């Protein structure tokens, strides 16, 4: 269900020729048909969320095709022109290097980088926002970047919730409870849901849910009897908050609305939204 202000609406793309129109319409249809409530104050916030999701998907595919390597933190490496490898295996931005340039280098020179899947997901999020922000804004918000597991800049606002419906552009986690300790890095896989039943995970590539579960099961202890599984934990960029920094020149998606109800009372507690 999609709510704009106090109106429950069924949105649709009005310009079929705009970039990724079909993908955006699919996302809107999924959100409108889900039981989960997606609440926005304005149509502009919905447009930002839609474009952010598309850019998360395209950034995930770009990273997959970049040559970016899968390595444990003990074996991680990065381009020393822009980053310093920390003692824990993270990537610390060098002084006087614009974050926008350093993030783009990961996608241009992926073979010069290697790390685990959680860090890859954060890199994808930064790249998606860079597509929607002026470089000056991005560099101001995300100065002194450190890329290491789930450590991320405090100005990157994320929402993690348990339960809810899967939408393309969501970050979801596959858990492998009986992983072989010799390959502990396969205890789970952070992935971006690409839509059409496919996920991207750094290390497994672009695969279906069943294929990712199979890959994780192959890395369990001998005689394991518990299968890997897709958890119900979903992580998203808080698009309502992050839309404040969007570039005025960012093209807005043309969205029309079929009104369903215009007197909804919306209440949000934590990350749960209810409509009365």
Swiss-Prot record:
The keyword Transferase applies. Its EC number is 2.3.2.13. GO terms for biological process: sporulation resulting in formation of a cellular spore. Keywords: Acyltransferase, Sporulation, Transferase. InterPro entries: Gln_gamma-glutamylTfrase_bac. GO terms for molecular function: protein-glutamine gamma-glutamyltransferase activity. It catalyses: L-glutaminyl-[protein] + L-lysyl-[protein] = [protein]-L-lysyl-N(6)-5-L-glutamyl-[protein] + NH4(+). It is an enzyme of class 2 (transferase). Probably plays a role in the assembly of the spore coat proteins by catalyzing epsilon-(gamma-glutamyl)lysine cross-links. Belongs to the bacillus TGase family. This is Protein-glutamine gamma-glutamyltransferase. It comes from Bacillus cereus (strain AH187). The lineage of its organism: Bacteria, Bacillati, Bacillota, Bacilli, Bacillales. The gene is tgl.
């Amino acid at each position: 269900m999609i709510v704009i202000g106090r109106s429950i609406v069924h949105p649709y793309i009005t310009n079929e020729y705009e970039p990724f129109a079909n993908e955006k319409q699919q996302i809107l249809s999924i959100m409108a048909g889900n039981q989960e409530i997606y609440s926005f104050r304005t149509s502009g916030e919905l447009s930002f969320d839609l474009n952010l999701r598309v850019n998360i998907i395209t950034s995930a595919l770009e990273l997959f095709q970049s040559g970016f390597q899968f390595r444990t933190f003990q074996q991680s490496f990065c381009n020393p022109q822009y980053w310093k490898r920390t003692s824990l295996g993270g990537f610390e931005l060098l002084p006087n290097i614009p974050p926008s340039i350093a993030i783009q280098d990961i996608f241009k020179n992926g073979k010069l980088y290697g790390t685990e899947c959680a860090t890859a997901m954060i890199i994808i999020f930064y790249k998606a926002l860079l597509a929607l922000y002026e470089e000056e804004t991005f560099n101001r918000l995300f100065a002194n970047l450190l890329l290491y597991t789930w450590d991320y800049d405090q100005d990157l606002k994320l929402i993690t919730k348990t339960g809810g419906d899967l939408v393309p552009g969501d970050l979801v986690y596959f858990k492998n409870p009986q992983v072989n300790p010799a390959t502990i890095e396969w205890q789970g896989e952070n992935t971006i849901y690409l839509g059409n039943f496919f996920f991207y995970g750094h290390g497994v590539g672009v695969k279906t849910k069943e294929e990712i579960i199979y890959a994780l099961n192959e890395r369990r202890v001998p005689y394991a009897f518990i299968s890997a599984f897709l958890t119900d934990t979903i992580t998203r960029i808080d698009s309502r908050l992050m839309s404040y920094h969007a570039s005025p020149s960012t093209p807005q998606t043309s969205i029309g609305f079929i009104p369903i109800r215009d007197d909804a009372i919306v209440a949000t507690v934590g990350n749960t939204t209810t409509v009365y």
